[in-house]
């Protein structure tokens, strides 16, 4: 599991559209699709239901989202702590 995949997953969960998610992560739609498919393969479950012009989180996607968000937040806090010598705020 890669940080980029988690970030793309979280953005797609917000946008519910592959094209808009690709724009937000500064890549092409096919890369977003590939990252999500790889993440789904690693987790062994589908995270999104793909519809004609949008996607919806599956039950598994809803369960996974808070963990992905927490992982990204923890990584960013760790990055700041190392880069700037500060401790993360909060519990």
Task: Annotate the PLM regions.
Residues 75-83:
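A short, exposed helix-loop element centered on a Lys and neighboring polar residues
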Residues 40-57:
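A short LG(V/I)-centered, amphipathic sequence patch enriched
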Residues 12-28:
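Short helix-boundary/capping micro-motifs
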Residues 2-8, 29, 61, 68:
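The N-cap/first-turn positions of alpha helices
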Residues 84-91:
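Interdomain hinge and pocket-entrance segments immediately C-terminal to HTH DNA-binding domains
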Residues 24-25, 43, 64:
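Core residues of bacterial helix-turn-helix
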């Amino acid at each position: 599991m890669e940080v980029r995949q988690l970030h793309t997953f979280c953005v797609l969960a917000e946008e519910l559209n592959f094209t808009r998610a690709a724009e937000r992560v500064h890549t092409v739609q096919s890369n977003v699709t590939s990252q999500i498919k790889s993440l789904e393969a690693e987790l062994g479950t589908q995270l999104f239901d793909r519809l004609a012009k949008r996607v919806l989180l599956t039950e598994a996607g809803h369960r996974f989202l808070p963990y992905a968000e927490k992982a990204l937040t923890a990584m960013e806090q760790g990055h700041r702590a190392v880069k700037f010598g500060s401790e993360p705020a909060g519990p």
